[in-house]
Amino acid sequence: MHATTVKNKITQRDNYKEIMSVIVVILLLTLTLIAIFSAIDQLGISEMGRIARDLTHFIVNSLQD
């Protein structure tokens, strides 16, 4: 009986750690997305267009080599 109780507690602790890990990952992804969208918002549309154009030219030039 005691061994079963200990095993159940260990299983509960492992489940708790797994759930907490998932929550931490979700929070980090959320913060990352917020930071990315905030940076995009601060750059403005014209800057984003310029960056996209430069990136497109870089990719095309890389493929032509």
Swiss-Prot record:
Descriptive protein name: Two-component-system connector protein SafA
Role description: Connects the signal transduction between the two-component systems EvgS/EvgA and PhoQ/PhoP, by directly interacting with PhoQ and thus activating the PhoQ/PhoP system, in response to acid stress conditions.
Keyword Protein transport: no
Transmembrane segments: 19-39
Topology within the bilayer: Single-pass type II membrane protein
Signals that turn on the gene: By acid stress, via the EvgS/EvgA system.
Subunit and partners: Interacts with PhoQ.
Subcellular location: Cell inner membrane
Cytoplasmic side: 1-18
InterPro entries to which the protein is assigned, alphabetical: SafA (IPR031411)
Ranges facing Periplasmic side: 40-65
Family to which this protein belongs: Belongs to the SafA family.
Keywords: Cell inner membrane, Cell membrane, Membrane, Signal-anchor, Stress response, Transmembrane, Transmembrane helix
Gene Ontology cellular-component annotations: plasma membrane
Keyword Manganese: no
